Every structure is written in C-alpha cells, then in structure tokens.
Amino acid sequence: MAQTERRDAPELPDFSLLKRLARDQLIFLLEQLPGKKDLFIDADLMSPLDRIANVTILKQHEVDKLYKVELKPIVSSSDQLCFLIRPRIQTVKWISDLVNSDKVAGRFRRYKIIFTPQKFYACETVLEEQGVYGDVTTDEWNFYILPLDDDILSLELPEFFRDNFLEGDQRWVTTGGGALHLLQSVYGSFSKVYGIGRCAKMVYESWRELMEEGEQRTRQPEFAKVFLIDRDVDFVTPLCSQVVYEGLVDDIFRIKCSSVEFGPDVTSSDKSIKVMLNSQDKVFNEIRNEHFSNVFGFLSQKAKNLQTAYDKRRGMDIQQMKAFVADELKGLKQEHRLLSLHIGASESIMKKKTKQDFQELLKTEHSLLEGFEIRECIAYIEEHINRQVSMIDSLRLLCLLSITENGLLSKDYRSLKAQYLQSYGIEHLLTFANLRQLGLLEEQQTGETLTVMESKVGKLVNDKTAGKLTDAFSSLAKKSNFRALSKRLALVPKSGEEYDLRVPRDMAYIFSGAYIPLSCKLIEQVLERDGWTGLEEVTRMLNGQDFAVTGGSSSSEARNKSNGQRIILVMFLGGCTYSEISALRFLGKERGCRFIVLTTAITNSGRLLEALLDKHV
C-alpha cells in the first residue's frame, strides 16, 4: 500500500533558500527602475513567478499593473515599462516595435528588459538592429531553478527539448551549467559526476568552466553524487502510458508548476478549483507514487478513518469539545476537503480511462515492450488511427512500435504513415520528418542498400577517409537497440511471472510490472558499480557519450559518508516524467538513499510529442 519513508532516510536539503535568493535578486532588479511601473510578463513565466514573488510582493516594490506579454499593441499609460521575459527574438522585436512606436508618437518613457534566466547576444543584436539599444536598459534575472517539491527542482524550460534535440540549438546548455553551479555554490561541492548523452557532456563542460572561473568555497556538502542524462537516451519511458497516480493526474489534467486545475467533474460543483500538488498535501503525498489500482482502496480506508475521528465528538463534555475544536477540527476539515478532491479526481480518471478502453491500450503497449504479437499490435494501432481516437495517442503508439522494433518494415511504415495523414491531415508530413530525425519513427534501412553505397563511395577515396565514411554509414544505420538493451539490463520481466502491485519488488511497478524504465535502470547500475565499468556494451548500444568524473577532495568525500553520500542529484536534460520520479523514490527507499530530481521541465508523452509537431500544425 502507500509507501512510507525509511526511518534512516537522509534529510533533504532546504530548497526554499533558492526561492529566497531568486526573490531577492528580482526585487533588486525592479528597484533599479525607481517609482511606479507597469510589469509585462512572458506567459510561461507567470506560474513560476507566482511561486517566487506573488502580486502582493510585486506591489510592495512599486509595480502598478501587471500584463501578460501578448505580442500586440499595449494599453499601458505608465511612464515606466518593465518587461520580464525569456530571451526570445520574437519578444524582443515586439518590445522594439513598442519603443519605436512611442518615438513616432513623441511619447517619452523609460524601458527596462529583464531577461531570465540569462540574456543572449542575439537578443541584444536585435535591439541594435531595431535602433532602440540606447533607449532600453537590459538586465539578467538568474532564475535558474524553481523548487516544485522537497525532491523536485525544475528549470521550467519546456522548449529545451525541441531547441536542443531537434533544432540543434545549444543556447540552453549554459543555463544547465548555471543551474548546477548555483546548486554547488549554495549546497556544497559534488564528489562524483556521472553522465550519458551529448547534451549531458556539454552541460558538464559548461558547469566545469563556471567552477574554474568562480571562487571555490569549502563547506559541508549536502549531497555528493550527480547523474546527468539526456532525454534521447530513453524515449520509451515517456512514451508509455503512466499508471502511477501523479503521472495519471498529469496526463489527464496537466500539472503546471505543481499546480492543477480540477474542473466541475472533480469538484462536484459548478466551479473549478486550483490545487497545489506537493508533499504539503498529506493525502496526495501518500498516494502520488502508488499504482492507480491501489488508490481507491487507500482513499476508502482514509475516509473511514476520518469518519472515526469525527465521531469522537459524540459523548464529549464541554472542555473536551473545546480542545477538539482548537486542536483537531481544522486539520480534519482540511483533510476532508483534500480527500474529496482526490476521490473526485480518481473517479474522473476512471471514467475517462474506461471510455478509452485503457486496459486494451495497456495490453498493446506491454506486447510492444515484450516483442510479442506485433501484427496484432499494428492492427490495434491502425484501428486507433482510423477511428481518429487521438492524434497524439496514435503518434505515441507509432513511435513506441518503431523504437521497440528498431524501425518499421517499409510496407508497414508507408501504410501506417498514409493512414495517419489521411486521418489527421497532410500537414503532419513535416512532423514525420521531425520524428525520423530524432529516431522516434523510422523506416528500417536495409543493410544491403547501405553496403552498396558504402562500397561505391569507398572506391573513390583513400583508406583513411573510407574509415571515417564507414563510421558515418554505421551511424546512419543506427538503431534504437531497445530489444538488446532490454535483454542486457532485464528491463522487461519474464512473461507469465506474477507481479503483486500492492507490494512492488522493483521499479517495474510504475508500469504495472511490465517494464523497468531504462533511464532509472541506468542510474541504478552506475551507482552500484560507481561508474560505467561493466556497462561498455550498454553504452555502445546507446551511442556512447558516457562519462564519470571524480571531483572535490578526499576529505570532502569522507565528510559525505554520513548524509551527503546518500543524497543523489539526477539531472534530466529534455524533461522527466512523474513516473520516473516515482521509480527513483522507490529505488531510494530500497537503497537507503534519496534522489533529488533536477529537470529542464516535467514532461509526458503528450508534451514530448506536441513539442515535435511541425510549428505550422
């Protein structure tokens, strides 16, 4: 049932300090523009900003009115305008147009742009090109990390995934390095750094440069080991349907900055309610990592216990009643409210999943993971597409089929692609190109074709160049290697084995016992081995780019043995799912350690695939 913390679990660092640092810096920057001012905020910064400095705090520092950046003419009458934005060229061009428009109208105002988490040279170039560089002041708000919960930190950069992995835009690499540098500055140095993936390597290099430039302070480290992993190392995990409670809530209601909006179908009223989902919500904290099949039983027992606590009032004298009202009643009412919401959310999830025939969907996914009944799986996917059930869900199943089968046979690829475009629109043709580029949805390349090309080109060049070309052709023919990886790391339990979801034996419980997430299995294996030794075959199948670096002094490592050595930071570059976080929490309990997840953003199959849709769709 509900998982409980081990008594010997290490204490987590206090991440509220990161919020205070971010708040203090923002206030300092706002005060650089003295007097009343209107503040324009990027839409995707509004929720994170509310967690750092709410409207009351902003008003205390002479912010008069707040507006959302909408890239259209403004209605502000203030003489001072402040813009809090991400470093995006489109937004900077819009600000430049506003300034130039005021110039034409003979209107004098003061303008300040605060870029967060950092400003890029390209943005300053736009200001110069538009002729407004001398009319605005620019600053940086180094808001690298938003603590979402006791063990979840986020850069809140959902665009990181598309920009880095699809567009090849590496501008956010320095942001990742800056986030690690901030953690090291505040919570002490790390003794060991492990990583896998091209982006992970670049983020590590960026962080190392910042360390070499900055002043090194010696202090008691609060956590020691760091593991950096690229999202493209493991695409299977985010493409699987989530079945732990927190993951399901995210899939259906979309959690944003640890907050979710429950509609009338959940609240049993005509109003929607915004709820914070974190460890402060005691009901949620007990069920967040549970497989959904266990949640109703837990909530039912909780409701009975609550009723028993209420029933204590009967037979109380006046003094006892006073004490009950003063000490317990408020807490019971709050628990009752939260319990009602989570029961409502569970019922809503159940209705939606029953309507979607969720069990049949899971059966298909599990067959794909195991490599069984592939023709039946393809027939199910075809039916899914032809019934136009869900554009994203159909795409997800196609990608899962392609990755687990190391690409699709030509006839299957062409047939499924044609059916998809016919059902959802020809405009998705470019989306297929994006998916192919990332290796998510590919047509199998026959070995003969590559061999013929290789031999023909090889005759035209010398041996040295031919060697390089062979490597290039090998990379063209690279496959996801999921089947081999699955066998090597025992990711898929043997078919027919009984799996008790009430008493999970490994991380596979997060996918109903069908699959251990590759990302989390890699972390487990590397920590057990204290490096990549013995995993050479695995890293080769993952196209290399693995590293393990010892940092800090031996005395630092000795100090870590008590608490810090048992707290491990895992940085996901390109996004992390709530299912992976649940798996790492389970692994932490098994190993007697705690994992802190630092991610560029929380993701799921919907967000990941939406990021890869062609921008014109």
UniProtKB/Swiss-Prot annotation:
GO cellular component: CORVET complex; late endosome membrane; lysosomal membrane; lysosome
Keyword Transport found: yes
Gene3D superfamilies: 1.25.40.850, 3.40.50.1910, 3.40.50.2060, Syntaxin Binding Protein 1, Chain A, domain 2
Superkingdom assignment: Eukaryota
Main location class: membrane
UniProt-listed Pfam families: Sec1
Keywords, in A-Z order: Developmental protein, Endosome, Lysosome, Membrane, Protein transport, Transport
Location relative to the cell: Late endosome membrane; Lysosome membrane
Topology in the lipid bilayer: Peripheral membrane protein
InterPro entries in the cross-refs: Sec-1-like_dom1, Sec-1-like_dom3a, Sec1-like, Sec1-like_dom2, Sec1-like_sf, VPS33_dom3b
Role according to the record: May play a role in vesicle-mediated protein trafficking to lysosomal compartments and in membrane docking/fusion reactions of late endosomes/lysosomes. Required for proper trafficking and targeting of the collagen-modifying enzyme lysyl hydroxylase 3 (LH3) to intracellular collagen. Mediates phagolysosomal fusion in macrophages. Proposed to be involved in endosomal maturation implicating vipas39. In epithelial cells, the vps33b:vipas39 complex may play a role in the apical recycling pathway and in the maintenance of the apical-basolateral polarity. Plays a role in bile duct development.
UniProt family annotation: Belongs to the STXBP/unc-18/SEC1 family.
Quaternary state and interactors: Interacts with vipas39.
UniProt protein name: Vacuolar protein sorting-associated protein 33B
Gene symbol of the encoding locus: vps33b
